[in-house]
Amino acid sequence: LKTDSAERKVPVYCLLKTDEYQLFHNHVVEQRLLNQENLYLFRNWNENSKLNKHTVTTPFRMIMNELFKTHDYSFHSFRHTAANHLSVLLNCDYAPLIKNLTDYTEEQYQSIRTELLRHTHGQNHWFMIAHLLGHIDPTETFKSYIHLSYLIAGHKILQSHPDIDTK
């Protein structure tokens, strides 16, 4: 954790696919069965200390370097991807955007929306994403993470003005 306020609850049960959730759940159960006070979900072997950032980033970079001749991918890229997937998922209809930009099925899309949102429309969508990223409000989230806002805005405009030619 960067700061004490960085600790938050993330509803992984609805965000992960069934097989992903099962692996995650098994890891959590395994950690609890060790009967040790674990302050960190992922920690150094036989220690109760947080992982050094290079424990994950170095192997990730090596794998990406093997897969791609040139790239700009970093482990932090997953954070951007998650923020953008959630922004589209919470603010757009399933077809065509969610169907074409993510690997979520329509059933998973509905389940995530039902679990995360109390209302079907509103600013709470952006505050939800900001909270999951550890931001107090959506300002930093939009400034640094939401790269698909124009796409989402275009989708919303088309919804409110169906007479606009989409070609």
Task: State each model region's role.
Residues 1-3, 20, 40-45, 63, ...:
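Extended charged low-complexity segments that act as oligomerization/scaffolding linkers
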Residues 2-14:
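DNA breakage-rejoining catalytic core of tyrosine-based enzymes
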Residues 3, 72-76, 95-98, 141-142, ...:
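Extended hydrophobic-aromatic, low-complexity segments
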Residues 11-72, 77-92:
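Active-site/catalytic core of tyrosine-dependent DNA strand-transfer enzymes
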Residues 21, 69, 91-95, 138, ...:
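A generic secondary-structure boundary signal that marks alpha-helix termini
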Residues 24-27, 98, 145:
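Structured alpha-helical bundle/scaffold domains in large eukaryotic membrane-trafficking regulators
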Residues 47-49, 109-126, 132-166:
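Catalytic-site neighborhood detector that most strongly recognizes the C-terminal catalytic loop/helix
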Residues 73, 83-86, 90-134:
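Active-site-proximal segment of tyrosine recombinases
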